[in-house]
UniProtKB/Swiss-Prot annotation:
Keyword flag Nucleus: no
Domain ABC transporter: 5-235
Lipid bilayer topology: Peripheral membrane protein
Enzyme Commission designation: 7.6.2.11
Entry keywords, A to Z: ATP-binding, Cell membrane, Membrane, Nucleotide-binding, Translocase, Transport
Protein's UniProt name: Spermidine/putrescine import ATP-binding protein PotA
UniProt function note: Part of the ABC transporter complex PotABCD involved in spermidine/putrescine import. Responsible for energy coupling to the transport system.
Subcellular location: Cell membrane
Species annotation: Staphylococcus aureus (strain NCTC 8325 / PS 47)
One Pfam family recorded for the sequence: ABC_tran
Coiled-coil ranges per UniProt: none
Catalytic activity: ATP + H2O + polyamine-[polyamine-binding protein]Side 1 = ADP + phosphate + polyamineSide 2 + [polyamine-binding protein]Side 1
GO cellular component: ATP-binding cassette (ABC) transporter complex
Family statement drawn from the similarity comment of this UniProt entry: Belongs to the ABC transporter superfamily. Spermidine/putrescine importer (TC 3.A.1.11.1) family.
Amino acid sequence: MEPLLSLKSVSKSYDDLNILDDIDIDIESGYFYTLLGPSGCGKTTILKLIAGFEYPDSGEVIYQNKPIGNLPPNKRKVNTVFQDYALFPHLNVYDNIAFGLKLKKLSKTEIDQKVTEALKLVKLSGYEKRNINEMSGGQKQRVAIARAIVNEPEILLLDESLSALDLKLRTEMQYELRELQSRLGITFIFVTHDQEEALALSDFLFVLKDGKIQQFGTPTDIYDEPVNRFVADFIGESNIVEGRMVRDYVVNIYGQDFECVDMGIPENKKVEVVIRPEDISLIKAEEGLFKATVDSMLFRGVHYEICCIDNKGYEWVIQTTKKAEVGSEVGLYFDPEAIHIMVPGETEEEFDKRIESYEEVDNA
């Protein structure tokens, strides 16, 4: 399938500061994509390039096989929902949503119909005459989305548009955004630095750092199989320790061999081992893969977060529903499937090829 939108070898700098460094992105129609990364990684710049608010220094922005890098925003089938919503405070809800339609000189009947449909989609039917200043943050968010979708864009861009909401409302809006995207069937490209938000909303994620794409994939793929230490650390909690590959399916962590599911890595190759906190069980000290001492325990609502120090001085974070007494000796246990091996310096292409080889072995 041909991508709906592509960025090909795109670079962008501001005042000699390199923001995007030769990136390639393919966006297919009808999916929810998220650009995820820390502040300054280039994610909002990508959104601006797609919208037409910025132009690339080099490379091409391609829409339906046609270069649009120099096309102005009003000529692109793209609408943007900004972080601050950018609503007109002197206009009511109806006039805010109808603003773009009036510029297109549509008839009053057409405008009424489209505004009514858009308000219904965002669950604000009956709010047409409401003053913007009388609305809550969540309602303003819905008005901004309605104003964007009323123009029937092929792509909807959302620039950290949930960040101003409180936690409960943000969670509610996540469900609503996902439902809205499914109903409309158009492409959403969402920018956030919130890992949990990205995992919850997305069909596909682009993880960025320093103007480069670190990894692309589904939320499950990226969480379960991070390509490098940055991704493993940025997406959720991780225990990361240095190791050495003994042979296929066996890795050595500071002198002790552990079974794993990784293969195709040279023997004695230095690697980094990732084990997620929720994949570690606390058991009796003598029954564990190794022993550790409980250093601290915090209650996180749905689980306890327990920090343990092993006899080599490494700190392990465990998420469990069981309590443990600070200062007590415990055993740590994890299955071979819980171990994920990262090879320092391995490119995403090399990493993907290695992971695909596991699937070929499983299917053989």
